[in-house]
Every structure is written in structure tokens, then in C-alpha cells.
Amino acid sequence: MRIEHDFIGQMEISDEVYYGIQTLRASENFFITNDKLCSYPVFIKSFAQVKKAAALANAQLGLIDEKLKIAICHACDLLVDGKYHDQFIVDMIQGGAGTSTNMNMNEVIANLALEYMGHQKGEYQFCHPNDHVNRSQSTNDAYPSALKIAIYERLSNLVAPMKALRDAFAQKAKEFAHVIKMGRTQLQDAVPMTLGQEFETYALMVDRDIEQVLDARNWVRELNLGGTVIGTGINSHPDYRSLIEKKIQEVTGRPFVMANNLIEATQSTGAYVQVSGVLKRIAVKLSKVCNDLRLLSSGPRAGLNEINLPKMQPGSSIMPGKVNPVIPEVVNQVCFAVIGNDLSVALAAEGGQLQLNVFEPVIAYKLFHSFVILGRAIETLTTKCVEGITANEKICHDYVFNSIGIVTALNPHIGYEKSAMIAKEALKSDRSIYDIALEKKILTKEQLDDIFKPENMLSPHAFKKHKD
């Protein structure tokens, strides 16, 4: 055991661990979610990149010596490589605007650096968590900058599963291009379309959301490093701000820049609201698609039954043979959670006061949660559902030609009123629109056959109005 102290007192720390007294206090104070920092490696890596960039800038400015720079950078590289992540034990939701997370990072890096230099853990006179690792920084610029770097990476990582889903929908659109079916508005028969057109809209929806995700990265490119406490830059070197921008670009390989006004950037959480809004947009639209898939596959005998979803597992403990649309159902629920997380982000952003928003920990927690579950849900929907969807072509075809909705195709030829009369009689007699129109000799068989050709009902079509 080793003894560490702070201005509150002292505590015994196990010699096996790399965190220190402030981390231990935080772990005892905040047992809220049981989701610890170690559950989010992207945040640990981005925070380590911030600390490495700071060490490089501080060394160049002569604020720390070369030996310390090398040791701190070595420790940061270990964290970026995924090592020692079990040492990050603070709860994701915490009081103090993220200070506990920042100090967990400072203490682990300091003790890793001490070992690298041949010292014992806790010998902070050689490498101090605050004086050396946290030099030229405050939690108030280090935490949000690390968070934005992590969000940038999560946005980038979300693109691949979204592209896979888009491509799966596009492939189904090609497969189903010849399958004519009934389009519906307000759950009532409308006009014909193809199943391919339906799936093409899903592919386009995802493609547009991919554009939104890529654009959202620009909202988190602007950091507030060098602002320290409230953005004024107290306790930082006059050249630190320009230098840290170059160093963070070198360390991350990403086009991050420092905000023009660090005071505004330190208190602003607008970028998080925008990113969360994009995730909510994806969730809302994805949930609607899952609603469609569940409805289109309903049945098999007493529903629409236009498509078949892959059978994943038995659906009932009491009804033999029942299979449920479990994949769209789970994605629906993920989308509900993402939408709820967005509300939490909005409330936390609104809750800021004066020069700092202390609620960034819950913003970080909710955003990371949304990224994780939404990414997994998209992959699950792609591989366990969309790729295996098949069409019930005869059912789709019969719905069209037994539908009252195709009477709309007669409108340009015989007018609305006569078309409505035919629809009314077809409903009353349980006969087809085609048979009623033919029987009344309103149009010839050749004319009706031409009007009701699928290709003439699926897109704009030139016509001549037939005389009464």
C-alpha cells in the first residue's frame, strides 16, 4: 500500500493500481450508473491524445523538461493502444463538470510515466498529475476537447454500418424491382407501386442520413484547448493556444482547430445538441422503417404478408409455430432509447449557467450510449433482417388487382365521379374494378388492359381522355 494525500486528507492506495487519491475519492462518491470510464475506450484514447498534445506543447515552450515529455507521451501512447484501461474507474455521471474523469486520466498517466522513468507510483515530485500532466490545462478545456475528439471518431465509425444497411436496402430494391404491390396512405389502399420502389426509399433515407453524420463531424472540430478555466487562458503561456492546435492535429491526424472565442466555446454545448439531433433523426427514421417491416410481414394468414422476414427464434411460450419480428422490434426499442437520450442532452445543455456547463458528463454518457446501441442496432438490422427478406410476389400482385385503389388510374379517362361510382359498386358487390368497368362498357377491354398495365400505373404516363 502507498499513502497519498490531498488538501482534504490522506488515503491508502493499493500499490497495484495506477490511479490515485482523487480517483479513489470519486469512485466512492459517485456510484450512479455502474458504467465506468473504462467502458468507453474511445473517450480514454481521445483524452490521452489531449494530454499528449499538451505535453508536446508544454515541452516546446520550456514548461516541462524533455525527460518528462517523453515519459508522459509514452504513458499516453500506452492508453491510446488500449492498455491499462481497467484503471479508469470513475462513474460516467459525476459532479464537478468532469474533474473526476480528468484527474483519473492525470493520475494514471503520471504513475505510468513515473514507472517509465524508474520511480515508484505516487512519487509525484518527479511527475505530478496536476503540475506536469495537467500543465496549461483545466478540466474545463481538456474534458470537452477530449469529448469532441471522441465524438468525431464515433461519427466516423457510424458510417460503415450505415453504408452496409443502405447497400442491403438497395440490393433488395433491385431484387424486388418487378414485384408490383399496393401503396398505402393512412393504412388504406392508395395506388400501385413496386416493392423495389419501397425498398429504394429506405436506401435513399439511409444515404441521406450518412451525409448528415459526415457533416456533423464539422460541428465538433472546434476545440477550446488553451482556454483553461473559463476561456481567458489563465495559467497558460501566450503561445500555447496556437501551438496546441498544431500538436492536437499531429497527434490525432484530424483537422481540429481552436475556437476563435474560447470564452464562448468553453460555455457552449451547442455542438452536442446538434450531434444528438442527428442521432435522433436517424433513430426516428429507422424506427419508422422497422414499423413498416413489421406491418408488411404481418400474418402469415391474417395480415398483409407481403414480405417474409428471416425466422430468428420461436415467438411464443404458448402459441406453437408463432414467429415474431424480433429484429425490427429490438431496433424500435433502441430508437426509443436514442430519442430519450437526445432529450437528456437537450436538458443538460439548457442547464448550463454563466461561464460553464457542469453537466457535460451526462451529455457524454448519453451520446456514447446512443452511438453504441445505434451502431449495434444498425448492424443487427442489416445482417439479421434486411439481407434475408424475401417477397410474396403473388400476394402483392393480387392485392393490387383486387384493390379498389386502382380505380384512381381511371380518373384521367372517365373522370372522378364515374370512377367513384365504379369503386362504390365494386366494394358493394365484392368484384374487381376491372370487371365492373368492363361490364358497364365505359371503356373497351383494350383500353382497360392498357390503363391497368403495371408500367402505366407506376410512373407518370401520357394519356388521352376518352369521350363519353
Curated annotation (Swiss-Prot):
Cellular compartments per GO CC: cytosol
Gene3D superfamilies: Fumarase/aspartase (C-terminal domain), Fumarase/aspartase (Central domain), Fumarase/aspartase (N-terminal domain)
CDD domains: Aspartase
Residues spanning the membrane: none
Active site, per annotation: S316 (proton acceptor)
Keywords in alphabetical order: Lyase
Ranges where the record places region SS loop: 315-324
Keyword Protein biosynthesis among record annotations: no
Keyword Lyase carried by entry: yes
Binding sites annotated in the UniProt record for L-aspartate: T99, S138, T139, N140, T185, S317, K322
EC identifiers of the protein: 4.3.1.1
GO biological process: aspartate metabolic process; tricarboxylic acid cycle
Gene Ontology molecular functions: aspartate ammonia-lyase activity
Reaction equation(s) it catalyzes: L-aspartate = fumarate + NH4(+)
Pfam family, one: FumaraseC_C
Quaternary organization: Homotetramer.
Family, similarity comment: Belongs to the class-II fumarase/aspartase family. Aspartase subfamily.
Function (record text): Catalyzes the reversible conversion of L-aspartate to fumarate and ammonia.
NCBIfam families listed in its UniProt record: aspA, PRK12273.1
PANTHER family per UniProt: ASPARTATE AMMONIA-LYASE
Protein name per Swiss-Prot or TrEMBL: Aspartate ammonia-lyase
